[in-house]
Amino acid sequence: MILPINTYSDPVLAMKAKPLKGVDSAIEELIAEMFDTMYKAPGIGLAAPQVGHSLRLVVVDISTIKEYADFKPMVVINPRIVAVRGRSLMEEGCLSVPGIAGNVVRPSAITLHYRDEKFEEHTADFHSMMARVLQHEIDHLDGTLFVDRMDKRDRRKIQKELDAIAEGRVKADYPLARDVNRVEAEA
């Protein structure tokens, strides 16, 4: 099932998500739906708060990027960044902020402690694009969007577009929670 995506200014995106205590059939179903939703949008990462679940759960698949064609889809539960290295500036976008992109400075490499879809613990190093995608998605779990990390001057330049999203005046090629909720209210 394709889940509607919550957009900029939705309260769930500003909350610190709750850790998972384990993986049961409901979480397995949510993981599958998150992958379906991410692929349909299309995106390369999706955090549970983006689909209305305040849980520390992320799915990532960067194999659509040529240099990462061999990458295997990844489920990240209860992630915690334990070390950072380097620094890089790159343009980011987000399914929760449709139609907007902006430059964000982030560490270029991270060491991450997390659990997988079987709730097994891992500690691994990630660099380059994967480090960036993981940090972007982990930000969602902490109530932060990439626009919150943009330079203040750049952020001011996109404020009208952000206001339009907050007011529901935005279209996307994937279902938005605000549109779904509006249709349900009218029914």
UniProtKB/Swiss-Prot annotation:
Catalytic residues (positions): 137
Gene3D superfamilies linked to this entry: Peptide deformylase
Cofactor(s) required for function per UniProt: Fe(2+)
Entry EC no(s): 3.5.1.88
GO biological process, one term: co-translational protein modification
Enzyme class, broadest EC rank: hydrolase
InterPro entries per record: Peptide_deformylase, Peptide_deformylase_sf
Alphabetically ordered keywords of this record: Hydrolase, Iron, Metal-binding, Protein biosynthesis
Cofactor details (free text): Binds 1 Fe(2+) ion.
Keyword Nucleus tagged: no
Any coiled-coil regions, as ranges: none
Chemical reaction(s) catalysed: N-terminal N-formyl-L-methionyl-[peptide] + H2O = N-terminal L-methionyl-[peptide] + formate
GO MF entries: metal ion binding; peptide deformylase activity
Superkingdom assignment: Bacteria
Positions contributing to Fe cation binding: 94, 136, 140
Function description: Removes the formyl group from the N-terminal Met of newly synthesized proteins. Requires at least a dipeptide for an efficient rate of reaction. N-terminal L-methionine is a prerequisite for activity but the enzyme has broad specificity at other positions.
Family named by the database record: Belongs to the polypeptide deformylase family.
NCBIfam families recorded: pept_deformyl (TIGR00079), PRK00150.1-3 (NF001159)
Listed name of the protein: Peptide deformylase
Organism expressing this protein natively: Chlorobaculum tepidum (strain ATCC 49652 / DSM 12025 / NBRC 103806 / TLS) (Chlorobium tepidum)
Gene: def
